[in-house]
């Protein structure tokens, strides 16, 4: 598969940017990703009250050995991710210069060394809040528009999922402020980006930081954090031609209490689709306090609540192209199809009836959505000039629900013409209740080894994840008319209960050794212990056969690579990295009859990163070779056979120029 993408845009107000991205990829095996059917409406933006985009996070000094360096490192730590102080619209915001591809931002998605994206021996993209505003990005799914070689989609049963480098779904890990919560197809939800500082994307295996999964890459959503300085307030609003609207408010800065800084954000997005009776309503509110106890110690606490209420589009029935009364569309779908929901049959040419393009076949009482609550707290302690300790504890509580007619399919055996009750419908209801607790602690040591600067990070992480599912087993079905469906209501429901518990503990080490001022070795290794237990009860409360069961996994993953600045603004890099994930499904739905094994994935990657002397032009190039072994495929329902391996090879090129 070869794809060529061209993207150009302009930066409003502060400067103009001409952004070109080029992607050419060859994938030996890739998975298709369902795309959102909602039309991408062009919003009419009302200018913000105050525009004060956050500056990129600052990288601490490589080897602070003097009091001056120590002070600089503390300052960078306190102001990490700080928004610029309010300035006139004609004046550039204060803080470090953001490069065209934003590679000067510190990221946590690929490494815990505290280095900028440019210094990583991997392809790391950072989409800043400013970039999101310039490109009109409103939701986390839209972030794919700003990333090279990344596809995003809102499939109704698994919203906010991504595909990159030939992998998709649960092989792409999703993190929230560096915290994994579980397989993305089970935990992913659409989210407004107004409260985010940046979105970090690493491409290729990344289990070193992201843990189980991350075969194709990982995406980290990073919230805005407080800054030290005058209070800055900002607000925005927009509306579109479908009467959808979006509004938000943010505020942050120093309080009257010495050393106490705050950040608060709230937003709401009502996004209406072009299919009858479809919409997505997203609400986010978040806040954080930072308190500088002294020059060496900072403590903080954060809370975030997210809610989405949705009426998703579940598809339009395919109909026989030659059936009596059908008004076919052209250039939309073509080919042969048979209704496998009803046992198949002889494949026939199909089309979509032109009169059903906006028809909703879902039940009237359909709903989908989620309520999510995050509580996080931590500290950062500079123990000495060269040793620092940071830690965060977190709690996450989520309730998700689906209550829909998920299948609408033409049945030739009932009526082979428009007007008959020929559309077969089938229901599914599902509820999730998830509770996650955990801790991540990093010890960073900067030192000098034989005259060479060295940075070492040891990370200890532990979490307890309870994931409960209540799922309808009746799959109630009925028939409706193709052109005038009587949508009706959901009908009877009888639920089975599934309880999954996952305890995870990991120990990882990372190191960067600068052999010279221009050449550095970067590597890391992660040891992980994962204990899974599952129990399942049928709709009558009886324990199902082969349950409960448990399994322990002990994957070891890592990365080794180098970076070499061969000339000013020209850096070469290469890496070898590995990842692990379940062989047949995500870990929340493994059954005792499925192979309880892990796949192993590896990547070879090499590339070059270019940055002009004036930091107005930037380009990256990478070539990769990914292989995922021990892959199984479904057969006869819940039986699985070894399929061998998946492989993906390709190249990526990104370039951007900012005009004066």
Identify the meaning behind each predicted range.
Residues 194-197, 208-287, 293-299, 373, ...:
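Outer-membrane beta-barrel translocator/receptor signature
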Residues 375-398, 425-537:
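Face-selective signature of the C-terminal outer-membrane beta-barrel domain
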Residues 378-394, 398-404, 565, 572-573, ...:
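Membrane-embedded beta-barrel scaffold of Gram-negative outer-membrane proteins
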Residues 152, 163, 179-203, 222:
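Short acidic/polar hinge/loop motifs at secondary-structure boundaries
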Residues 86-125, 129, 135, 141-180, ...:
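Extracytoplasmic beta-strand/coil segments of soluble accessory domains associated
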Residues 292-294, 434, 453-465, 498-626, ...:
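Structural signature of Gram-negative outer-membrane beta-barrels, strongest in the C-terminal barrel
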Residues 269, 273, 286-292, 296-380, ...:
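Acidic/polar loop-and-plug regions of large Gram-negative outer-membrane beta-barrel proteins
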Residues 124, 132, 143-144, 199-204, ...:
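Non-catalytic regulatory/gating segments with a bias toward low-complexity or hydrophobic composition
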């Amino acid at each position: 598969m070869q794809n060529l993408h061209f993207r150009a845009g302009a930066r409003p107000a502060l400067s103009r940017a001409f952004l070109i991205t080029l992607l050419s990829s060859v994938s030996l095996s890739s998975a298709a990703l369902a795309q959102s059917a909602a039309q991408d409406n062009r919003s009419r933006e009302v200018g913000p009250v105050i525009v004060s985009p956050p500056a990129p996070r600052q990288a601490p000094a490589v080897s602070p050995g003097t009091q001056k360096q120590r002070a600089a490192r503390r300052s960078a730590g306190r102001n990490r991710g700080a928004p610029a102080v309010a300035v006139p619209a004609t004046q550039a915001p204060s803080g470090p210069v953001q490069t065209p591809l934003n590679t000067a931002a510190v990221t946590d998605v690929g490494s815990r060394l505290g280095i900028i994206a440019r210094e990583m021996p991997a392809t790391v993209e950072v989409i800043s809040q400013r970039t999101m505003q310039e490109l009109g990005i409103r939701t986390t799914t839209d972030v794919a528009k700003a990333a090279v070689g990344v596809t995003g989609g809102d499939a109704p049963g698994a919203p906010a999922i991504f595909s990159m480098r030939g992998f998709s779904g649960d092989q792409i890990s999703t993190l929230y402020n560096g915290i994994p919560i579980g397989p993305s197809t089970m935990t992913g939800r659409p989210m407004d980006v107004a409260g985010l500082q940046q979105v970090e994307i690493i491409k290729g295996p990344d289990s070193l930081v992201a843990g189980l999964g991350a075969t194709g890459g990982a995406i980290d959503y990073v919230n805005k954090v407080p800054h030290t300085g005058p209070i800055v307030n900002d607000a925005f609003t927009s509306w579109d031609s479908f009467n959808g609207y979006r509004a938000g408010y943010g505020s942050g800065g120093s309080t009257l209490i010495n050393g106490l800084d705050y950040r608060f954000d709230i937003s709401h997005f009502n996004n209406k689709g072009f299919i009858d009776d479809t919409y997505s309503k997203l609400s986010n509110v978040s806040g954080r306090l930072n308190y500088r106890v002294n020059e060496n110690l900072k403590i903080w606490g954060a809370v975030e609540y997210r809610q989405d209420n949705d009426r998703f589009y579940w598809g339009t029935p395919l109909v026989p192209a030659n059936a009596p009364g059908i008004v076919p569309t052209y250039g939309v779908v073509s080919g042969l199809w048979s209704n496998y929901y009803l046992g198949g049959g002889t494949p026939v040419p199909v089309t979509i009836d032109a009169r059903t393009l906006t028809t909703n076949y879902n039940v009237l009482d359909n709903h989908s959505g989620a309520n999510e609550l995050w509580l996080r707290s931590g500290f950062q302690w500079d123990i000495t000039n060269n040793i620092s300790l940071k830690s965060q504890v977190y709690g996450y509580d989520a309730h998700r629900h689906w209550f829909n007619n998920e299948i609408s399919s033409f049945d030739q055996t009932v009526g082979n013409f428009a007007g008959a009750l020929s559309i077969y419908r089938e229901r599914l209801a599902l509820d999730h209740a998830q509770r996650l607790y955990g801790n991540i602690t990093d010890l960073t040591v900067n030192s000098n080894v034989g005259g060479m600067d060295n940075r070492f990070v040891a990370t200890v992480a532990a979490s307890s994840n309870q994931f409960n599912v209540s799922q309808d087993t009746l799959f109630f079905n009925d028939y409706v008319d193709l052109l005038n469906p009587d949508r009706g209501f959901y009908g009877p429901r009888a639920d089975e209960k599934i309880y999954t518990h996952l305890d995870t503990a990991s120990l990882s080490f990372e190191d960067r050794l600068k052999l010279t001022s221009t050449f550095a070795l970067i590597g890391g290794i992660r040891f992980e212990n994962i204990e899974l237990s599952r129990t399942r009860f049928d709709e009558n409360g009886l324990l199902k056969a082969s349950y409960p069961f448990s399994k322990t996994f002990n994957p070891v993953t890592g990365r080794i690579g180098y970076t070499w600045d061969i000339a000013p603004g020209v850096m070469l890099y290469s890496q070898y990295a590995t990842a692990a994930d379940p062989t047949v499904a995500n870990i929340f739905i493994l059954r005792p009859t499925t192979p309880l094994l892990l796949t192993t994935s590896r990547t070879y990657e090499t590339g070059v990163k270019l940055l002009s002397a004036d930091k107005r032009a930037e380009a990256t190039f990478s070539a990769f070779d990914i292989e995922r072994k021990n892959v199984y495929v479904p057969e006869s329902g819940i039986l699985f056979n070894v399929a061998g391996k998946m492989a993906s090879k390709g190249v990526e090129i990104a370039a951007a120029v900012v005009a004066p």
